[in-house]
Every structure is written in C-alpha cells, then in structure tokens.
C-alpha cells in the first residue's frame, strides 16, 4: 500500500499557509479601517474648526480694536487647522503610496478596490473642507480690506482698489498713513483700526501661503481621481436601476404566473363541470 503520509502533511502545511495569509489580510484590513476612522475624525474636527474660525472672524470684525484673547484664539485655531490638515495629508499620502505599490505588482483584489474607494472618498471630503477654509480666509481678507478703505476715507484719504492691493502686497502701510494729520480722536481711531486690519491681513496671507502647496497637491489628486469616482457612481446608479428593474420584472412574472395559474384552474373546473353534464346527458339517454 502506498504511503501517503508525506502528501497529507504537505496538504496540511499548504492549508495552514492559506489560513495564515487569510488572517494576515483580515488584520491588515482591520488596521486600514482604523486608519479610515481616524482620518474621518480629523476631517470632522477640521470642519468644526473652520466653523469656529468664521465666528472668530465675525467677532474681530465687530470690534474696531479686538481684544488680545479673541485674536489669540483665532491664532490657536489657525495653528490647529494647519497641524490637523498636515496630519490628514500625510496619512492620505501613505495610503496612496500603498495602493500604487500593489498596482505596480499588478495585484487586483476586492480589498484593493475598497481601499481605493475609501481613499478617494476621504480625499474629496478633505479637499471640500480645505476649500471652505480657503474661501473663509479669502472672504475675511476682503472684509478687512474694505474696513481699511473705509477708515482711510474717514481720514480724508481716498484710494482705488488697485492702490490698496499694491499697498497690501508691499506691506508698506506708511505710504497711506504717514502724511495723515492726527488732528482728531476719530482720525486716531481710524488709524488704529487700519493698522489692526492690516496686521490681520498679514497673518492671513502667511497662513494661506503655508497651506497653498498642500491645497494644490490634494486638489490635483482629487481631480485625477474624478473620472474613477464618476465611473463608480455610474456603475452603482446603474446597478440600482438594474436591481429595481429586476424586482419589477419579477413582480410582473409572479403576477402573470398567478393569472395563468388561475386560468388553468378555471379551465379544469369548466372541463369537470362539462364532463359531469355530458355524463348526466348520456346516462339519461341510455335510460330512455
């Protein structure tokens, strides 16, 4: 009799290896989904911080000379947003590189498709929040610039929008303020507010520059993924349509089948009745 011990042992080792690979893959996906939840939490925090920034902007604009506490709170929020945004960007980059490595090895699996979809979704959400933040900063800059222009008018100095932009870009506020006579309290207050708003714009532009490269990088990433996302959404929508049509067709088939069954029963009943009538007629004739 042939000894199959070695063959059975090899088969067992192969099964053990497959089980280890399966367990490792499950563990990897568990870690991936933990990352996804962490990134999602960071994006939600960014969104909340952006809303808080809007409130601080309104508070600062409402006061000619905002208190230091409010300005410090805004600076802290700006720092937190920058820190969280860089963290999200770093984690999304790591996931992207991992996906590219597997694609380079021509690997294709359900897990890889899940990771690509999650990465695309998170990237879009991240860019949406950062776009809102960028729009919030730009709006605040415009409102600060309007305040400067109004205060300059109070001092008797009229400027065009282009002149004001040149001044803000150069950072030379003294071009407009040096020759203003401090002949009234109103003029002094106007100059103080001009200086305050100018300082706010300087801080804003520094923040915008710091986040600019990251914003462009992530926006380009999402744009490159756009076609893939559109294809996924198209397939999902058409899958839903197909399922709905299939359900509708099934209902119609059941309905038609039910009608056919009822017709069949009615025909059988008619045949039985007809048979009874014929039998009775024949019996009566023979009796005669």
From Swiss-Prot:
This is Syntaxin-1B. Potentially involved in docking of synaptic vesicles at presynaptic active zones. May mediate Ca(2+)-regulation of exocytosis acrosomal reaction in sperm. Belongs to the syntaxin family. Interacts with OTOF. Interacts with SYT6 and SYT8; the interaction is Ca(2+)-dependent. The chain crosses the membrane at residues 265-288. It comes from Ovis aries (Sheep). It is a single-pass type IV membrane protein. Its main location: membrane. GO terms for cellular component: axon; nuclear membrane; presynaptic active zone membrane; synaptic vesicle membrane; synaptobrevin 2-SNAP-25-syntaxin-1a complex.
């Amino acid at each position: 009799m042939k000894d199959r011990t070695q063959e059975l042992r090899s088969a067992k080792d192969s099964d053990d290896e497959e089980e280890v690979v399966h367990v490792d893959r499950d563990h990897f996906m568990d870690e991936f989904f933990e990352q996804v939840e962490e990134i999602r939490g960071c994006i939600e925090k960014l969104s909340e911080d952006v809303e808080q920034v809007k409130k601080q902007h309104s508070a600062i604009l409402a006061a000619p000379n905002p208190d230091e506490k409010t300005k410090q709170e805004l600076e802290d929020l700006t720092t937190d947003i920058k820190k969280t945004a860089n963290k999200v960007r770093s984690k999304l980059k790591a996931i992207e590189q991992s996906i590219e490595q597997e694609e380079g090895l021509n690997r294709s699996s359900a897990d890889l498709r899940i990771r690509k979809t999650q990465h695309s979704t998170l990237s879009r959400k991240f860019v949406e929040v950062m776009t809102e933040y960028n729009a919030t900063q730009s709006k605040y800059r415009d409102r600060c610039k309007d305040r400067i222009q109004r205060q300059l008018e109070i001092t008797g100095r009229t400027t065009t929008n282009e002149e004001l932009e040149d001044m803000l870009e150069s950072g030379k506020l003294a071009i407009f303020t040096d020759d203003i006579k401090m002949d009234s309290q109103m003029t002094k207050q106007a100059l103080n507010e001009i200086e305050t708003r100018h300082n706010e714009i300087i801080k804003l532009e520094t923040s915008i520059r710091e986040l600019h490269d990251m914003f462009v990088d992530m926006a380009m990433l999402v744009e490159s993924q756009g076609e893939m996302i559109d294809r996924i959404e198209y397939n999902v929508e058409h899958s839903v349509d197909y399922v709905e049509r299939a359900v509708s067709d099934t209902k119609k088939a059941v309905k038609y089948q039910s009608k056919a069954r009822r017709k069949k029963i009615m025909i059988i009943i008619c045949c039985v009745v007809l048979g009874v009538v014929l039998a009775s007629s024949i019996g009566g004739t023979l009796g005669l």
